[in-house]
A protein has these predicted regions:
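Acidic, metal-coordinating catalytic segment for phosphate/diphosphate chemistry
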Residues: 1-19, 23
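Short, P/G- and charge-enriched loop/turn segments at secondary-structure junctions
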Residues: 1-8, 81-85, 110-112
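Conserved Nudix-box catalytic region and its N-terminal flanking loop in Nudix hydrolases
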Residues: 22-61
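A generic structural micro-feature
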Residues: 8-12, 85-91, 114-119
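Active-site-adjacent beta-strand/loop module that shapes the phosphate/pyrophosphate-binding cleft
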Residues: 79-107, 143
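A short coil-to-beta-strand element that immediately follows conserved catalytic motifs
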Residues: 65-74
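Short, charged/polar surface micro-motifs in flexible loops or helix N-caps
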Residues: 24-26, 34, 45, 74-79, ...
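Nudix hydrolase/Nudix homology domain
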Residues: 35-37, 103-158
């Protein structure tokens, strides 16, 4: 069971994201439900560590098993979701991933994979393209140039 619950018109999520980089580009995705780019990842399940969750989510979405380099951020986000209109309180752990033992960089600049009933389109976005892209999380548009060496706690209000 995902660690996510709804109270009236608000929703709490505990999730993880994979920061996957190659040559000043970040791997982002979108699907038929979302007009914006976002990072691979998803909700943490009960009795699952964040590390287990990020590896599982990357496997489910990309069919590869990367290694975790290090945790980057614990982001406390407060926002209204563009798709469902709910007000979210989200805790998300962002992990820098090591993809050296995967084929992700050989899949091309844009590629598509299916997960269940959803089709995900993945795209390698140049760092300098993020500032003008419809991309979440917003803080990453600037922070991508200055990745922390230790886990950093932050808050984002929208």
């Amino acid at each position: 069971m995902d660690i996510s619950f709804k109270v009236e018109n608000q929703k709490f999520n505990y999730r993880v994201c994979a920061v996957i980089l190659s040559e000043n580009q970040i791997l982002a995705m979108h699907d038929e439900r979302s007009p914006y780019f976002y990072l691979p990842g998803g909700r943490v399940k009960m009795s699952e560590t964040a590390e287990q969750a990020v590896i599982r989510e990357v496997w489910e979405e990309l069919s590869v098993t990367p290694k975790i380099d290090r945790p980057l951020w614990l982001n406390q986000a407060f926002f209204t979701e563009d798709v469902d209109g709910l007000r979210y309180h989200e805790l998300c752990l962002y992990f820098l991933m090591d993809i050296s033992d995967t084929d992700l960089t050989q899949r091309g600049p844009v590629f598509t994979l299916t997960e269940g009933t959803h089709t995900h389109t993945f795209e390698w976005l140049a760092f300098d393209r993020l500032k003008d892209a419809y991309f979440y999380p917003i803080f990453l548009k600037k922070e991508i140039y200055n990745l922390p060496n230790v886990l950093t706690v932050r808050a984002e209000f929208e």
